[in-house]
């Protein structure tokens, strides 16, 4: 297998026309699923449909050979470790990993070293992305400073922040959280909470339950998440124009609270990771610290609740929480090892398990990976529409392969999915009309 990458830079050159023919074109938002062709010019989609338009005057023709041509995936939760931990990941290597996984837009979390809590650092991140990324890079900025005061949220939004979070840590102070929610409502951006009450979880390594007891390891109480979710919903329920987003939800009790909030008409959204709807705490016995993440893998009841939440719409989207770590950070006892796993190159096939197993329809699964996350951060992507950005992927839905972490483009290889057999493979990734990743057998 030969893989080729190109930096995004300014995207496809102006006026350059590419015809994608013999494709199964899927757009989850409009429920489009047709055999046809699609035309891009420069960085935009200009035409698509069932009729085979003439390819005369086209600069390049790509025969899709009946494969699925769909919007690029959008992952609103990644850690690219730049600045500060470039030995684990960089924007360059992280975006290579994204491209190989069919992810055309990522949202970087701000818990870098130093954290993205100032306009200077926000501009640095955007500059590095323009210089070294293969895909579109958006970012959250921090809610609080090191002094536990609110950041300059209006200025950070002006500098490009699509929302605010202290991900990696929760906003523990309820007054600070209330102020953040109020300010964000004026700015029209979400507050994204890492929902964890540290008073209930501090010092824990894995889910508190039968496995933590068996291994003699301090656990993280499931209620540490749901207590924080309930607190924040109470704080925002009487505010106008506020958007509260829960990162990497993992417990059934949290979903119950989110459903109640949605039923009341509150603007509450949430995401789930593939590992939380495919794995349980039981695999910690097999994989040890490689299966350590925060929030931790929980029970089968919680896992099934995640699947049900995706099916019913209580869970709005799928996001990876791509958290790269070098080997020395993971080759430690459970209590001392770093939290997190990589996920960009496994998000699509793991999500497609919901389709291949008959639990969800194809368009419903793909919606959680495309326009639904785009809507949470208010960007016009994740769709096939005329005059929108030509962010596209070509996917072989039925290609069977085995996940091998040694083949990941990410600088880090920390994944408990090594050796898992999956279906669904990205053949080509296009961003702003430019092929930035392709794979040939």
Swiss-Prot record:
* Catalytic reaction list: (S)-dihydroorotate + H2O = N-carbamoyl-L-aspartate + H(+)
Q: What does the entry list as the binding residues for substrate?
A: 79-81, 111, 294, 325, 339-340
Residues at the catalytic site: 321
Q: Which residues are recorded as binding Zn(2+) 1?
A: 77, 79, 167, 321
Gene3D superfamilies of this UniProt entry?
Metal-dependent hydrolases, Urease, subunit C, domain 1
**Would you say which domain of life the source belongs to?**
Bacteria
Q: What's noted on cofactor binding?
A: Binds 2 Zn(2+) ions per subunit.
A Gene Ontology biological process term: 'de novo' UMP biosynthetic process
The entry's keywords: Hydrolase, Metal-binding, Pyrimidine biosynthesis, Zinc
Enzyme Commission designation? 3.5.2.3
Q: Does the keyword Ribosomal protein apply?
A: no
Q: Name one GO molecular function term.
A: zinc ion binding
Which InterPro entries does this one have? Answer: Amidohydro-rel, DHOase, DHOase/Allantoinase_Hydrolase, Dihydroorotase_CS, Metal-dep_hydrolase_composite, Metal_Hydrolase
Instruction: Describe which pathway this protein belongs to, using the record's wording.
Output: Pyrimidine metabolism; UMP biosynthesis via de novo pathway; (S)-dihydroorotate from bicarbonate: step 3/3
| GO terms under cellular component | cytoplasm
Q: Which residues bind Zn(2+) 2?
A: 167, 194, 248
Keyword Acetylation annotated: no
Q: What does this protein do?
A: Catalyzes the reversible cyclization of carbamoyl aspartate to dihydroorotate.
Identify the HAMAP family for this entry. PyrC_classI_B
UniProt record similarity statement? Belongs to the metallo-dependent hydrolases superfamily. DHOase family. Class I DHOase subfamily.
PANTHER family registered for this protein in UniProt? ALLANTOINASE (PTHR43668:SF2)
Q: This chain belongs to which protein, by name?
A: Dihydroorotase
Q: Which organism is it from?
A: Wolbachia sp. subsp. Drosophila simulans (strain wRi)
| Source taxonomy | Bacteria, Pseudomonadati, Pseudomonadota, Alphaproteobacteria, Rickettsiales
């Amino acid at each position: 297998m030969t893989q080729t990458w190109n930096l995004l830079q300014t995207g496809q050159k102006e006026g350059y026309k590419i015809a994608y023919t013999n494709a199964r074109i899927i757009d989850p938002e409009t429920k489009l699923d047709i055999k046809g062709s699609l035309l891009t010019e420069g960085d935009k989609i200009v035409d698509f449909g069932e009729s085979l338009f003439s390819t005369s005057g086209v600069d390049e023709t790509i025969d899709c050979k009946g494969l699925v041509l769909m919007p690029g995936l959008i992952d609103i939760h990644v850690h690219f470790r730049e600045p500060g931990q470039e030995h684990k990941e960089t924007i360059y290597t992280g975006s290579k990993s994204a491209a190989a996984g069919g992810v055309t837009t990522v949202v970087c979390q701000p818990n870098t070293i130093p954290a993205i809590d100032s306009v200077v650092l926000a501009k640095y991140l955007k500059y590095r992305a323009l210089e070294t990324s293969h895909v579109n890079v958006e970012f959250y900025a921090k809610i609080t400073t090191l002094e536990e005061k609110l950041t300059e949220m209006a200025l950070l939004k002006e500098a490009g922040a699509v929302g605010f979070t202290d991900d990696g840590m929760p906003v523990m102070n309820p007054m600070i959280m209330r102020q953040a929610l109020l300010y964000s409502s004026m700015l029209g951006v979400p507050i994204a909470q890492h929902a964890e009450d540290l008073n209930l979880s501090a010092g824990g390594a894995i889910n508190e339950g039968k496995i933590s007891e068996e291994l003699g390891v301090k656990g993280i109480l499931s209620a540490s998440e749901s207590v924080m979710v309930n607190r924040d919903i109470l704080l925002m329920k009487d505010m106008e124009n506020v958007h509260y987003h829960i990162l990497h939800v993992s417990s059934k009790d949290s979903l119950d609270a989110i459903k109640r909030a949605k039923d009341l008409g509150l603007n509450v959204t949430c995401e789930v990771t593939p590992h939380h709807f495919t794995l349980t705490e039981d695999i910690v016995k097999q994989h040890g610290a490689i299966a350590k993440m925060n929030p931790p893998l929980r029970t089968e009841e919680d896992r099934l609740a995640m699947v049900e939440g995706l099916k019913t719409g209580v869970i709005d989207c799928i996001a990876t929480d791509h958290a790269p770590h070098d080997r020395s950070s993971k080759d430690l006892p459970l209590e001392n090892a770093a939290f997190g796993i990589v996920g960009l190159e496994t998000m699509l096939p793991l999500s497609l398990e919901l389709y291949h197993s008959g639990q969800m329809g194809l368009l419903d699964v793909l919606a959680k990976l495309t326009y639904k996350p785009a809507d949470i951060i208010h960007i016009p992507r994740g769709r096939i529409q005329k005059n929108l950005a030509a962010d596209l992927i070509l996917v072989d839905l039925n290609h069977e392969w085995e996940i091998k972490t040694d083949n990941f483009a990410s600088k880090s290889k920390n994944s408990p999915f090594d050796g898992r057999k999956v279906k669904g493979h990205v053949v080509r990734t296009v961003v702003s009309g430019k092929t930035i990743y392709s794979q040939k057998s």
